[in-house]
A protein has these predicted regions:
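Short, Lys/Arg-enriched N-terminal segments with co-localized hydrophobic residues
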Residues: 3-8
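Glycine-rich FAD pyrophosphate-binding loop
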Residues: 29, 42-63
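Beta1/beta-strand and adjacent pyrophosphate-binding region of the FAD-binding site
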Residues: 20-34
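A conserved beta-strand/loop capping segment in the N-terminal third of enzymes
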Residues: 70-126, 133-134, 140, 145
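N-terminal Rossmann-fold NAD(P) dinucleotide-binding loop
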Residues: 37
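Predominantly flavin-linked oxidoreductase catalytic cores and closely associated redox partners
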Residues: 43, 123-191
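Short, mixed charged/polar active-site loops
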Residues: 23, 97-100, 160-167
Length: 191
């Protein structure tokens, strides 16, 4: 195992030394605990894969929370998470022209994202995923390039600040951290 020396500056590769230190190891690290990340972590954990679900926590996404019936069935979403069932939609133009859009399969379920996302994260944890609240910082690799190290900041619950750095080792990383994914920006620079 390797230890990162110092902090990371933008566009600067971290340096390594050979000092041994204990770093938790996971087969997969999932960055982002929204529906995609939480369900990926759950599926992997159910298959016996050691997985860390890393999520910032403490925020609500600006999303309508619409879930089609097929997804409700396939992802085994309990009825009590549905806050409404919508059976039609309407588009209104700036000139007030209206177009009704029928909803196939009878309805679209609406969920409160705060409750829904937390339900999925808890379900992933109950199925074996390790869940940590923290902010993803960066990815680095050892000199051989065969170990991926994921660096993140853990939230200090007493002071409610992201204060101390942590590092885990993994074989694979899933960037489920949204449209402006920091994981993707680092791994695919011109994306």
């Amino acid at each position: 195992m390797y230890k990162l020396e110092g902090g990371r500056m933008k566009n600067q590769k971290p340096t390594w030394n050979s000092q041994k230190t204990h770093i938790e190891k996971f087969d997969v690290v999932v960055v982002g605990g929204g529906p995609a990340g939480a369900t990926a972590a759950e599926a992997l954990a159910k298959d016996g894969v050691s997985v860390l679900l890393l999520d910032k926590g403490g925020r609500i996404k600006p999303c309508g929370g619409a879930i089609p019936p097929k997804a409700i069935e396939e992802f085994n979403i309990p009825e009590e998470l549905l806050v409404a069932k919508i059976n039609k939609a309407q588009i209104v133009s700036p000139k007030r022209n209206k177009v009704d859009i029928p909803i196939e399969n009878g309805f679209v379920g609406m969920v409160d994202r705060e409750n829904f996302d937390e339900y999925l994260r808890v379900r992933a944890e109950k199925n074996g995923a390790v869940r940590k609240i923290g902010a993803f910082n960066f990815i680095s690799r050892n000199k051989k390039g065969n170990n991926i190290l994921v660096h993140y900041s853990v939230r200090n619950k007493i002071e409610d600040t992201e204060s101390f750095p942590e590092t885990v080792m993994t074989k694979f990383i899933i960037g489920a951290d949204g449209a402006n994914s920091e994981v993707v920006k680092q791994e695919i620079p011109d994306s």
